[in-house]
Swiss-Prot record:
Pathway the protein acts in: Cofactor biosynthesis; (R)-pantothenate biosynthesis; (R)-pantoate from 3-methyl-2-oxobutanoate: step 1/2
Keyword field: Cytoplasm, Magnesium, Metal-binding, Pantothenate biosynthesis, Transferase
Coiled coil: none
Cofactor: Mg(2+)
Gene: panB
Binding site for Mg(2+): D43, D82, E114
Any one GO molecular function term: magnesium ion binding
Superkingdom of origin organism: Bacteria
Family: Belongs to the PanB family.
Pfam families, sorted: Pantoate_transf
Active-site residues per Swiss-Prot or TrEMBL entry: E181
Gene Ontology cellular component terms for the protein in this record: cytoplasm
GO biological-process terms attached to the record: pantothenate biosynthetic process
Name assigned to this protein: 3-methyl-2-oxobutanoate hydroxymethyltransferase
Length: 279
């Protein structure tokens, strides 16, 4: 399994990092079989699999539950788990308890924190405590209400310079990697070039050191909105819908289950029980 040092070496050797989300054991197994470098158990699971409108309702217990499942499905892949909304903005002791549960109880290999200057101290203290941290800048879904919705960040010179400063600050604080979301390609490329830690983009162009996408978006699973930066490699929703409809039709018609999908007694047992053959 790769380590934090492995990812730094990949950047040095200009080898791109492939990261993908997973929220359960079966999807984690498929992602691992595809030789993905890193799995993200994102709090995006709130919208993707739990039916919420945002990541805000996702709890620490939710993240622990899903990280455990992913760990069981992908035992040999580095797993990064999101610390959910407001679990790292109170006292550091509370933050440390949550981090400990995600690492020790759930089995995460690293934790991801969203924010900018307000999380620098937390990153530094968690890193000193032995917790590997991935920082998340640009569009930060946990702060979407403050940021005014899901929109591209750092679109002007002032905000682009601030983003670069924030990126350098999280690196200095000890983060071993950085996720940049919904940032213009030129800005993300500059940040990737100026940082020594890997920069993983999502909607941030090809100049990043790696890419991350949501599993369900990539395979077209579900009816949710697919962001414009996502490349959908297959759409499995329609075949699933067709299979469900066919199942219902066959049950209603009495054609499922047929003899190929049912168990039958041996002839001598039928004779003993019922005194003759059954039709």
């Amino acid at each position: 399994m790769k380590t934090t040092a492995s990812f730094k070496k990949m950047k040095q050797q200009k080898e791109k990092i492939a990261m993908m989300t997973a929220y359960d054991a079966p999807s984690a197994r498929l992602v691992e079989d595809a030789d993905v470098d890193m799995i993200l158990v994102g709090d995006s699971l709130g919208m993707v699999v739990l039916g919420y409108d945002s990541t805000i309702p996702v709890t620490l217990d939710d993240m622990i539950h899903h990280t455990k499942a992913v760990k069981r499905g992908a035992k040999n892949t580095f797993i990064v788990t999101d610390m959910p909304y407001l679990t790292y903005h109170g006292s550091f002791n509370e933050t440390l308890v949550g981090a400990k549960r995600l690492m020790q109880e759930a089995g995460a290999d690293a934790l991801k924190l969203e924010g900018n200057g307000d999380i620098i101290d937390t990153i530094e203290r968690l890193t000193l405590a032995g917790v590997p941290i991935v920082a998340h800048l640009g569009l930060t879904p946990q702060n979407v209400a403050v940021e005014g919705g899901y929109r591209v960040q750092a679109k002007d010179a002032k905000s682009a310079k601030q983003l670069l400063a924030d990126a350098k600050a999280v690196e200095a604080a000890g983060a071993f990697a950085l996720v940049l979301e919904c940032v213009p390609e030129q800005v993300a490329t500059q940040i990737s070039e100026e940082l020594t830690i890997p920069v993983i983009g999502i909607g941030a162009g090809a100049g990043c050191d790696g890419q991350v996408l949501v599993y369900h978006d990539v395979i077209g699973y579900g009816a949710g909105h697919v962001p414009s930066f996502v490349k959908q490699y297959v759409n499995i929703t329609k075949p699933i819908e067709e299979a469900m409809k066919q199942y219902v039709q066959e049950v209603k018609a009495g054609t499922f289950p047929d003899k190929d999908h049912a168990f039958s007694l041996k002839e001598n047992v039928i004779q003993e029980l019922y005194g003759g053959a059954l039709t």
